[in-house]
Each structure stands twice: as structure tokens, then as C-alpha cells.
């Protein structure tokens, strides 16, 4: 069981996690900010989360230890976007590519992956549902000025990596494709002390 000092730490980290994982980031000068793409009337923010941030967020929502341990085997990347184009922009993370510093593809762990994990460990259905709404939708037609945000999860790379995204446009996906890239993302590979029990 978690001791009192750890729980105090979790409460503070949980509040931080909520702000980090659910808010759409706003920057005065997004073109010069790390982890931001701007172009084609589109702004995309991406940030890899630390294990403590991820663990605190879900621990604060009552997730069991078995689920938290699974999160330590993945890197969570929070992505948010908004566009001001006159047409529809299609959010489809399956079309995105993540690459390590050597150009190798990094595996994205989609909802099918997590559903298999939750079934294997008999995760509570309420926690499964909560986890689901914190992930980016697998497909959504974004209307002008409609914000969206959530996480994608990947196999943790050992160094910097890039996110290349592709967006179809237009009601029937017949408009010009938008392609962009965010580089210099980094995942922390160590386990969260909140799960291992080493928190001060």
C-alpha cells in the first residue's frame, strides 16, 4: 500500500497531470516553441510525458496497480491541435509515423493493443472507459476552429524521436493532404516511483 507521503505527492502530481493531459496548449509564439508545428492554418502541439506525470494522473482516478505497471512499459505523448481552415481536417493517428533518430519506425500502441492488455489482466471496465477518453480518437472529422487533444502511446524509444502526421482534408477526404513533422521529442524510460514504491 502507498504510504501517506506518497499519497500527498500523488495528489499534487495528479493536479499537474490533469492540466498537462487534458488542456489544449496555447503559446504566444508557437513557431519558436519546441514541440509545436504551425502551417497550413494548423497548429499541432506534442509533448512526451514523464512516468510520474502519467502515473499520477491515472492513480488519481483510482486505477489499479496492475494497469499502472502496464503504463510504465509505454511512452505517453500528449497531442493537441486546432485548425482554422475553411474545410474539414481528418484526425487519423493510424496514418502517422513516429521515427527514432536513425529513421526506424516506432510502434504505436493503439486501442486494440490496450484492449488485449486489459482483457489479459482483467482490468476494471470503469478504468478502461476512463483510459479510452484520454486517448486521441482513431478517426474524427475536425471542423474549423474545433480543438482536439489526447494521448498516443508508443514503445519507448531510447533517444530523440519525431512525429510525422498526415491529415486528409475535405468532407470526402478529397482535398490536399497536410503533412507535417515535430522533432526532438524525448521519452523518459525509467519507471515511476509511485508504482515501484520508491517515492520519498
Residue ranges of each PLM-predicted region?
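Intrinsically disordered, low-complexity peptide-like regions
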Residues: 1-2, 108
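Bacterial N-terminal signal peptides
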Residues: 13-23
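Conserved functional micro-motifs across diverse proteins
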Residues: 27-200
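Bacterial N-terminal signal peptides that target proteins for export
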Residues: 2-15
Amino acid at each position: 500500500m502507498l504510504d501517506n507521503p506518497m499519497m500527498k505527492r500523488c495528489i499534487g502530481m495528479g493536479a499537474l497531470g490533469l492540466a498537462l493531459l487534458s488542456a489544449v496548449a496555447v503559446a504566444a509564439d508557437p513557431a519558436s516553441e519546441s514541440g509545436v508545428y504551425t502551417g497550413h492554418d494548423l497548429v499541432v502541439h506534442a509533448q512526451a510525458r514523464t512516468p510520474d506525470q502519467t502515473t499520477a494522473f491515472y492513480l488519481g482516478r483510482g486505477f489499479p496497480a496492475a494497469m499502472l505497471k502496464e503504463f510504465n512499459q509505454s511512452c505517453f505523448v500528449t497531442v493537441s491541435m486546432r485548425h482554422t481552415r475553411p474545410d474539414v481536417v481528418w484526425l487519423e493517428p493510424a496514418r502517422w509515423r513516429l521515427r527514432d533518430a536513425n529513421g526506424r519506425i516506432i510502434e504505436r500502441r493503439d486501442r486494440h493493443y490496450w484492449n488485449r492488455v486489459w482483457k489479459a489482466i482483467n482490468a476494471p471496465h470503469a478504468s478502461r472507459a476512463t483510459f479510452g477518453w484520454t486517448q486521441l480518437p482513431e478517426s474524427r472529422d475536425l471542423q474549423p476552429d474545433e480543438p482536439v487533444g489526447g494521448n498516443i502511446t508508443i514503445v519507448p524509444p531510447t533517444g530523440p524521436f519525431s512525429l510525422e502526421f498526415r491529415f486528409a482534408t475535405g468532407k470526402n477526404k478529397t482535398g490536399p493532404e497536410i503533412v507535417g513533422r515535430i522533432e526532438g521529442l524525448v521519452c523518459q524510460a525509467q519507471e515511476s516511483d509511485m508504482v515501484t514504491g520508491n517515492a520519498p
